Amino acid sequence: MRDHSYAPRARGGRHAGHRARRAVLLFLLLAAMPACRAGIDHLVPYDDSGIWKRSNQEIVEYGVIAIAAGGALWEGGESRLGKTFWRSIDSGVAAGLVAQLMKVTFSRVRPRDSGPAPGDPNLWFQGHGNESFPSGEVTEVSSIVTPFVLEYGHDHPGVYALELLPIYDAIARVKVQAHWQTDVLAGFALGTGTAWLIHRSPNSPFILQVMPHGIYVGLKKSF
């Protein structure tokens, strides 16, 4: 039998919540519009060395995913920490799916494939294989760390340091000419906005609800 003794977080009024959701959805829509690039896109000198090296970017991306998945399975969903882990899984999956759909829809050419310097950031809807907008990795990292910032930031301000991970990834992706500046900004907005919506939902976490009892209570109770 599942223990539902975990106290739910305080939530605002229903109407205020609906207004906030609409505001976030509008923000995400604006972030997804090609017209919002506002002239900030430009090709930067290629840099795949030091902390910006591609292998280090992959360590951050896969490390964040592994910690979220491992923490969710280990902790289960009966504690505040466990529920936060599972919300990060929800937001990571949801934001990742939306990002992939947007990539295929907008089919934007990556900076490294857009021609000689300074490149052409205006190559949208170029068909299969062009998936620059938005940055999937920045979307993924921001969607996974944001639930922890939202849940614990007020009590433990140091948690805000987690935001350095998507910021690092955004800079690194631009430096290796894999994304334009608006690609990573849109990815950050998409990941953060998705996590916020899931955090605010009284029915989250969602994926946890279809998990078997052994996963719900956490693997730690099996040892």
Predicted regions and their residues:
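N-terminal transmembrane-helix/juxtamembrane module of multi-pass inner/ER membrane proteins
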Residues: 2-22, 27-76, 82-86, 99-130
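Membrane-embedded catalytic cores of phosphoryl/pyrophosphoryl-handling enzymes
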Residues: 7, 115-222
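Solvent-exposed loop/turn segments connecting transmembrane beta-strands
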Residues: 53-60, 78, 177-178, 210-215
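Alpha-helical transmembrane segments of integral membrane proteins
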Residues: 59-62, 84-87, 91, 157-160, ...
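Hydrophobic alpha-helical transmembrane segments of multipass integral membrane proteins
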Residues: 62, 66-69, 98, 141-144, ...
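Sec/Tat-exported extracytoplasmic proteins
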Residues: 63, 70-74, 93, 97, ...
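Membrane-interface alpha-helices
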Residues: 80, 88-89, 175
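Hydrophobic, lipid-facing residues on alpha-helical transmembrane segments of integral membrane proteins
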Residues: 85, 89-105, 143-144, 185, ...
